[in-house]
Amino acid sequence: MTETKNSKMLDEGGKSVVALMAALMAAIFAFQLNASMLSPALTTMRVELNTTDAQIGLTQMVFFTSCAVFSLFLPRLGDLIGRKKVLLGILVLTALGCVVSALAVNVPMLMIGRVIQGVAGPIVPMTLIMLHAKVTEDKKYAKLMAILTSVNGGIGGVDAILGGWLAGTFGFRSVFWVMVGVAVLAIVLVFVYAEESTASETPKMDWVGVVSLAAAFLAAYLAINEIQKLGSANWALVAVEIVIAAVLFVVFWNVEKRQKAPMVTTHYLKQRRTWGLLLTTLLTMTGVFAIMNGIVPALAQDTEVGAGMSASVVSFATLTPYALIGLAFGPVAG
């Protein structure tokens, strides 16, 4: 009797789970296109905006910085006030940022658009939390989670190929307009098919912890960005930023110890296994993304020291292979 009842519940929920998966995958697409679709278009952006590679690289930096900062607190905010509500807000702002970037007439305007687009940073973890609120069976959740995360490293290379073709044929602005379309589609699907959910307990948001941690992270990030200039780096500025980051992290730690509902429990931050997982993920993704989505495409398009490939060709030759591997092995890992 119990087995029949469980099967019936799974069957009745089947259609809603499929619809939810479609909505969540569309949301992940909206983020992923912002992260990977521009890689083959960076050279085109430099030419059309009449700027330098360094300036275009800076627009990428501000996007990922923005992603990281928003990822620190938006998932927690979703737990407290509603994950669907927060995800819809993220997607609306992402679409707005894409519009600003598409209309950009210079690098500063493009940077503003990319900062706004960075709100999409926490989309992947938020979709996984929303999926788990719907699918609580571990085995089934692991399979569905793997499907969602398998597209996070690149949509089978299609995003890179399409980005290169659009940039080479219609200019870099067309890439952003496609992002707008995908974000709007995701908004509609999430609004219709996703269900609202929150954490079991919903205390007030720890905004003091949010601000102190975000500021500490930003100071450390700026220090790292300055260090990469090597010979031309302002080492006094680096030292100041590192000190500021350390002080703000101490402030964050003490705030969290006193909070009844902290954003991050310091008990977990003291555990070696926490940092092992975080550092492994950070270092791996930093290396892979910097090489495969930055250095390799730029070198392949360089006409002086590289292969001199077009944007459309470099997408297929450098970005598609590893995206296909990720798409194939994500479900296998799950």
Describe the residue ranges of each PLM region.
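Cytosolic juxtamembrane N-terminal segment immediately preceding the first transmembrane helix
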Residues: M1-L33, V47, Q259
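12-transmembrane solute porter fold
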Residues: V17-Q32, L38-P40, D53, A236, ...
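Helix-breaking motifs and short loop linkers at transmembrane-helix boundaries and internal kinks
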Residues: E48-N50, G82, L103-M109, G171
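Central cavity-lining transmembrane alpha-helices of secondary-active solute carriers
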Residues: M61-P75, P125-I129, F316-F329
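Conserved MFS/SLC helix-loop-helix module at the cytosolic interface between two early adjacent transmembrane helices
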Residues: V69-V105
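Paired small-residue
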Residues: G97-V100, P108-Q117
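Cytoplasmic helix-loop-helix junction between adjacent transmembrane helices
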Residues: V115-S150
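Hydrophobic transmembrane-helix bundles of small-molecule transporters
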Residues: G168-T280
